Design a protein with these regions (language model features):
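Short active-site neighborhood of thiol/selenol oxidoreductases, capturing the structured segment around
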Residues: 36-48
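Short, charge-rich binding segments
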Residues: 64-66, 91-95, 102
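Typically the conserved alpha-helix immediately C-terminal to a functionally engaged Cys/Sec
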Residues: 52-65
């Protein structure tokens, strides 16, 4: 059962204040992720401690980097159940995990960060991994290689 909205609102805002679009319905997820064009980050938010202490701060750090995905999205596990399930269907080859981060390029998951890759790590270390993935898959050089 989802937590009361007033409890999770600050956790949602910790992500959306960095330009990440929240997807709360199946229709929103399909409209955003479904076309599969360009690069998109999908952050699966969570109420857990490793989201608060690692994943959300790491996301903020990584998004301050010059190179980042064209589209930034988030769903909230345990809150927006249908939207989260639909988002996870786009990266079904990966075990459901929250928090987690999927980096999608042209409809294909090219990088995935599971919860176990977040737990016990500093936000800086997690962000460094995300930035490396951004450089590899989202840079102008990466785009030129796809053409």
């Amino acid at each position: 059962m989802p937590y009361h909205e007033t409890m999770v609102k600050p956790m949602r805002e910790e992500v959306t204040r960095h330009g990440v679009t929240e997807l709360r319905t199946v229709a929103e997820v399909d409209a955003a992720i479904g076309p599969g064009e360009g690069t998109a980050l999908v952050f699966v938010n969570s109420i857990c401690g490793c989201a608060a202490g690692g994943a959300r701060p790491a996301l903020a750090l990584a998004l301050s980097h010059g190179v980042k995905p064209q589209h930034l999205y988030t769903v909230f596990a345990g809150q927006d159940l249908d939207a989260t399930a639909r988002a996870r269907s786009y990266f079904a080859d990966y075990q459901p995990s929250s928090p987690s981060v999927a980096l999608v390029r042209d409809g294909e998951v090219v990088h995935f960060v599971h919860r176990h890759m977040i737990e016990g790590r500093s936000p800086q270390a997690i962000a460094a991994d995300l930035v490396a993935a951004f450089e590899k898959y989202c840079s102008p050089q990466a785009a030129a290689k796809r053409e």
